[in-house]
């Protein structure tokens, strides 16, 4: 199901990031910690615009569902249950034609020793299942020891060891002042990172092609 773009977009619109952030920062500080884009919006500027604004200008060309999306920090510009439902409806029709059974179960591992992280994952479960309906999508949270969690995320020996669907167990900090310091991490040629971030070893697999990562490579290079 995760290979379906509409399904992935439905999940993106279904996650309440303010509530997620509030598990660490408190209710009043939840929104201030929200970021809606992988690259920090004001990380770099060109032609009088910051990076986030340049991306927002192009978003509508990706699909009508992206019109009006605000990528600025400290507000949840992506959480939209109505858009989530609309995207899921498109995905469900295609997935049913492929024989996918509902509800779709998504495995989500979490380090059980971190109460805050457990609460964050539970907040994702609540918002996704509320927006899309438990008869459509169920998040199965797997609370693991710190060692077991690390062995399937940060310290996984290979992609096959990363047997999960969603995870909060990955992170990245920039190394230099260019968007590529973020964007290159997700290129198919970034072998160690593709294993850790997206769970694949073979850059030429059918899944890589289907979700558009080869096209992503070209866009970053251009």
Where on the chain are the PLM-derived regions?
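Short beta-strand and adjacent tight-turn residues that come in two discontinuous sequence segments
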Residues: 163-171
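Residue-level recognition of the N-termini of beta-strands and the immediately preceding loop/turn
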Residues: 100-106, 136-139, 164
């Amino acid at each position: 199901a995760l290979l379906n773009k509409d399904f992935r977009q439905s999940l993106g619109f279904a996650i309440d990031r303010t509530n997620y952030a509030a598990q660490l920062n408190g209710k009043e500080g939840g929104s201030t910690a929200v970021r809606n884009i992988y690259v920090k919006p004001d990380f770099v500027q060109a032609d009088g615009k910051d990076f986030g604004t340049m991306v927002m200008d192009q978003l509508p060309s990706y699909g009508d569902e992206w019109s009006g999306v605000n990528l600025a920090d400290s507000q949840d510009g992506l959480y939209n249950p109505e858009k989530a439902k609309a995207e899921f409806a498109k995905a469900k029709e295609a997935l049913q034609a492929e024989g996918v059974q509902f509800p779709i179960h998504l495995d989500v591992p979490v380090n059980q020793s971190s109460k805050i992280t457990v609460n964050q994952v539970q907040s994702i479960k609540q918002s996704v299942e509320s927006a899309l309906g438990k008869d459509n999508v169920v998040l199965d949270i797997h609370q693991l020891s710190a060692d077991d969690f690390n062995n399937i995320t940060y310290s996984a020996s290979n992609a096959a060891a990363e047997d999960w669907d969603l995870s909060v167990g990955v992170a990245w900090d920039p190394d230099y002042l260019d968007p590529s310091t973020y964007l290159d991490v997700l290129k198919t040629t970034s072998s160690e990172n593709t294993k850790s971030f997206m769970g694949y070893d073979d850059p030429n697999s059918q899944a890589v092609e289907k979700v558009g990562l080869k096209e992503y490579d070209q866009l970053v290079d251009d």
